[in-house]
């Protein structure tokens, strides 16, 4: 059984894709928590709870921002590895999300160095819905990619050993 650079790329990508799946699951949970906190009508009029809610939203947004750049870098590493390994089909499947990540990064708010997830704007229902849909779409993409990479690890090793 031979071990090629392409097989190594798929194995490393498989492990890193699992971490991206956990990142996105955390995003989904955080958005759901923001949505639940936003819709709780009992505590809307409680001024003592308002300060705590604002701190909670700021904390969640800060944690979300810390996961954005690593996610973009890991996915960029996927594309770079597949380009070096000459895995053109896999690279072609990953390029659209890479371009979306680049577009999202370069169209971040101009007023600061933060990538996205501003505590004030995230509580807008439309933005929160958009972020949640984006997270679900990324989860679907990363799950499908995970199983594709798993298949390609086996196919790459089997192809080389034959």
Swiss-Prot record:
Q: How does it sit in the membrane?
A: Multi-pass membrane protein
Tell me where on the tree of life, at the top rank, the source sits.
Eukaryota
- Taken from the record's topology, the Cytoplasmic segments are 1-10, 94-138
Task: Tell me the Pfam families matching this sequence.
Answer: Cornichon
Which gene produces this protein?
A: cnih2
Q: Give the Lumenal compartment stretches of this protein.
A: 32-72, 162
GO CC terms: membrane
Report the locations given in the UniProt record. Answer: Membrane
GO terms in the biological process aspect are: vesicle-mediated transport
Q: Which family does it belong to?
A: Belongs to the cornichon family.
What name appears for this protein in its UniProt entry?
Answer: Protein cornichon homolog 2
* Annotated function: Regulates the trafficking and gating properties of AMPA-selective glutamate receptors (AMPARs).
- Species lineage, top-down? Eukaryota, Metazoa, Chordata, Craniata, Vertebrata
Q: Identify the PANTHER family for this entry.
A: CORNICHON-RELATED
């Amino acid at each position: 059984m031979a071990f090629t650079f392409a097989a190594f790329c798929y194995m490393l990508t498989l492990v890193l894709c699992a971490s991206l799946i956990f990142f996105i699951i955390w995003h989904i949970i955080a958005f759901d928590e923001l949505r639940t906190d936003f819709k709780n009508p009992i505590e809307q009029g409680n001024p003592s709870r308002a300060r705590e809610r604002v701190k909670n939203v700021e904390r969640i947004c800060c944690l979300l921002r810390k996961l954005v750049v690593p996610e973009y870098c890991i996915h960029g590493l996927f594309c770079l590895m597949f380009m070096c390994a000459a895995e053109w089909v896999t690279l072609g499947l990953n390029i659209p999300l890479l371009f979306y990540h680049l577009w999202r990064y370069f169209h971040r708010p101009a007023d600061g160095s933060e990538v996205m997830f501003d505590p004030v704007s995230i509580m807008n229902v439309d933005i929160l819905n958009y972020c949640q849909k984006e997270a679900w779409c990324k989860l679907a993409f990363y799950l499908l990619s995970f199983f594709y990479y798993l298949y390609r690890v086996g196919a790459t090793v089997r192809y080389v050993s034959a």
